[in-house]
């Protein structure tokens, strides 16, 4: 479940294991129209009102931020997602760098991880520049 800073449910992220990596399906509503940074953060904790408790982008491999930079991207770098004029996000994102558990970049490691939607778009450069965190969801096993 994705929640905003008021604790309201604004969407969900579902993760499916693929032959190589994962498929990430994100749906959300109540998001300002436009492009938004979407990242996997290093700690499965959305308790802080600004979601800083989720830590930095997930980078277990030590790579730098930015799809368009050298020695990058790190595992938590994901493509921007778009909210339409009604504030709805519906996106499928793939990552060959991430795994659910095991291998080099497991989302379900000891301290977990969290998906974050940011207020603005990621620059894909050395600094994300995506602004404040507006929605957060801890990665959990499906029940």
Residue spans of the language-model regions?
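N-terminal leader/targeting pre-sequences
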Residues: 1-143
